[in-house]
């Protein structure tokens, strides 16, 4: 069986080396006669897996000891509510940036708990970039400052960390582990796993200890309180054990690749060559301001959108899967997360070039 190049936005491609390990260990994990999916979450086997995964992630991202790393059930959308529930405390206001689909959904959810103050709105630029930081409307006081580092639907990525004295909260669901960054600049970071860390159903939260002291809103269920999850080391109930195990394997894979910095260089090369091809083409187009182009999700359109179905059909026939754009924007989207190889991007560029010659 030959595997295709999977450009899905999520659930996304998983490194083949990791899949081979899962295959080899699935029936009999480390000689115990059981799958890791079958063992007790409180048994020594899984506790060892969980602790090693946390150590590896802390090492990869240089997470200070003053932060807890939580492995939680649910997707990132649950965090849209958990963040204000846990961090508002006595504040009535929180600051948000509207940079695209996912930040907009977070803002809508936050309205159930507070008055979200928009520092800036990329809608002014038709979501093709971020307004200059000098123009942002920044209040002196607010519970936190929230932004999405990479908008998977819109193809926008922040090339910088926003400059603010407020507690910085960031959704890094689609680019965590794709480049180094200074964790200490943030109060809280969260990321669902199905982009760069494995399976849907697991979300990783990195939260500063000081924020765990904030009193959650009175209506916050105990299960949605960060402090309780931290106290119980993410074992309030049965966690998503297999997803946690797989994330741990991916952390090992990242280390074996040379670490996050090595992957960052590779990701930059992949994105640069794809954007270079699109920019030179008279048939394909990317509307995003080059400064804010995502390294993870490359959106593009065909000059003749009547050819969209044919493009997708022929791409699939050539082993290039899941290139259809998000239903809200249409067009095409190539998601080139950590697991996507440079060979995969080269194959896509070659196919796009051949398609343009035939139909351009």
From Swiss-Prot:
Cofactor: record remark: Binds 1 pyridoxal phosphate per subunit.
Alphabetical UniProt keywords: Amino-acid biosynthesis, Aminotransferase, Cytoplasm, Pyridoxal phosphate, Pyridoxine biosynthesis, Serine biosynthesis, Transferase
Chief location category: cytoplasm
PTM sites of type N6-(pyridoxal phosphate)lysine: 195
InterPro entries for this protein: Aminotrans_V_dom, Aminotrans_V_PyrdxlP_BS, Pser_aminoTfrase, PyrdxlP-dep_Trfase, PyrdxlP-dep_Trfase_major, PyrdxlP-dep_Trfase_small
Reaction catalysed by this enzyme: O-phospho-L-serine + 2-oxoglutarate = 3-phosphooxypyruvate + L-glutamate; 4-(phosphooxy)-L-threonine + 2-oxoglutarate = (R)-3-hydroxy-2-oxo-4-phosphooxybutanoate + L-glutamate
Transmembrane portions of the chain: none
Localization annotation: Cytoplasm
GO cellular component: cytoplasm
Pathway per the UniProt entry: Amino-acid biosynthesis; L-serine biosynthesis; L-serine from 3-phospho-D-glycerate: step 2/3; Cofactor biosynthesis; pyridoxine 5'-phosphate biosynthesis; pyridoxine 5'-phosphate from D-erythrose 4-phosphate: step 3/5
Gene Ontology MF term list: O-phospho-L-serine:2-oxoglutarate aminotransferase activity; pyridoxal phosphate binding
Keyword flag Transferase: yes
GO biological process, one term: L-serine biosynthetic process
EC number: 2.6.1.52
Domain of life of the native organism: Bacteria
Binding-site list for L-glutamate: 42
Binding site for pyridoxal 5'-phosphate: 102, 152, 171, 194, 237-238
Family annotation (PROSITE patterns): AA_TRANSFER_CLASS_5 (PS00595)
Cofactor (UniProt): pyridoxal 5'-phosphate
Function, as annotated: Catalyzes the reversible conversion of 3-phosphohydroxypyruvate to phosphoserine and of 3-hydroxy-2-oxo-4-phosphonooxybutanoate to phosphohydroxythreonine.
Assembly information from the UniProt record: Homodimer.
HAMAP family recorded: SerC_aminotrans_5 (MF_00160)
Record's protein name: Phosphoserine aminotransferase
Native source species: Coxiella burnetii (strain CbuG_Q212) (Coxiella burnetii (strain Q212))
Gene giving rise to this polypeptide: serC
